[in-house]
């Protein structure tokens, strides 16, 4: 890829990774409109690293507190709200890990088409709207409990289907289960850390085993652009939902789904 493609695709990935609007739906548009080829494994690793650094840095205080409390619960038997939340996040990660390994090949073969992405973009946009309208919006992430955490984890596993949006599915589930908007978003973002880390490790392993020549300058650019875009996106998203709710993102998803359908049937 040339520098322009790296910047545009890393910007798209960084901006859409944490918004409930589906990164896969957006990454398909350049290929449809401009005829760009698949970005490749090295680029995927780079943007995942950039997104991971962004969410860890943004929630650095929470991450440190969760990690230290989790370790204290293991080695010292000390229980706290943070240790419970850390265990719930780990529990919520398991469905995506298990189903991801089990269904990876099937998803790659049958569910990566633009038609599937268009349908899921619209369908899960409507679910997000319904959840935002009907939610009690009373609970914080510290009141989630293991049952709700596991259900949110299964929602995260649904995001293995392209077009669903990991953050969209998890925030929708959290709202349905009674979390307030900010808590739903924070829980979703914290849940993303082990998932993105695991994906980056697996893709890095595949990359080095493939023996492909790595353009480290393009990789560094992809990391930097996706980091800045993702960090900015997290900050603005939390401000927007506290004032306007999920409606702007629902409208955007419906418009994007319509645009994808137009390209499919043109």
From Swiss-Prot:
Keywords: Antibiotic resistance, Cell inner membrane, Cell membrane, Cell shape, Cell wall biogenesis/degradation, Hydrolase, Membrane, Peptidoglycan synthesis, Transmembrane, Transmembrane helix. One of its GO terms (biological process) is peptidoglycan biosynthetic process. It is a multi-pass membrane protein. It is found in: Cell inner membrane. Catalyzes the dephosphorylation of undecaprenyl diphosphate (UPP). Confers resistance to bacitracin. GO terms for molecular function: undecaprenyl-diphosphatase activity. The lineage of its organism: Bacteria, Pseudomonadati, Pseudomonadota, Gammaproteobacteria, Alteromonadales. It catalyses: di-trans,octa-cis-undecaprenyl diphosphate + H2O = di-trans,octa-cis-undecaprenyl phosphate + phosphate + H(+). InterPro entries: UppP. This is Undecaprenyl-diphosphatase. Belongs to the UppP family.
């Amino acid at each position: 890829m040339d520098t322009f493609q790296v910047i545009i695709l890393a910007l798209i990935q960084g901006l859409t990774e944490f918004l409930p609007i589906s990164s896969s739906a957006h990454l398909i548009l350049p290929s449809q409109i401009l005829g760009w080829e698949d970005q490749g494994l090295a680029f995927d690793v780079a943007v995942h690293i950039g997104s991971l650094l962004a969410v860890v840095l943004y929630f650095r205080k929470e991450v440190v507190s969760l990690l230290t409390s989790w370790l204290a619960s293991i080695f010292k038997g000390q229980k706290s709200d943070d240790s419970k939340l850390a265990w719930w996040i780990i529990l919520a990660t398991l469905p995506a890990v298990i189903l991801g390994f089990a269904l990876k090949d099937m998803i790659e073969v049958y569910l990566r088409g633009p038609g599937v992405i268009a349908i899921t973009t619209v369908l899960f946009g409507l679910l997000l709207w319904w959840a935002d309208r009907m939610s009690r919006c009373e609970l914080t992430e510290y009141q989630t409990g293991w049952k709700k955490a596991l259900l949110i984890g299964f929602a995260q596993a649904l995001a293995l289907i392209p077009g669903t949006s990991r953050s969209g599915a998890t925030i929708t589930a959290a709202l349905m289960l009674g979390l307030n908007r900010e808590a739903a978003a924070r829980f979703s973002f914290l849940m993303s850390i082990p998932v993105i880390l695991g994906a980056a490790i697996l893709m890095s392993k595949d990359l080095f085993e493939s023996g492909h020549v790595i353009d480290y300058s393009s990789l560094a650019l992809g990391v930097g652009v996706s980091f800045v875009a993702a960090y900015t996106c997290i900050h603005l998203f939390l401000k927007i939902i506290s004032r306007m709710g999920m409606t702007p993102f629902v409208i955007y998803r419906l418009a994007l789904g319509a645009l994808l359908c137009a390209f499919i049937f043109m």
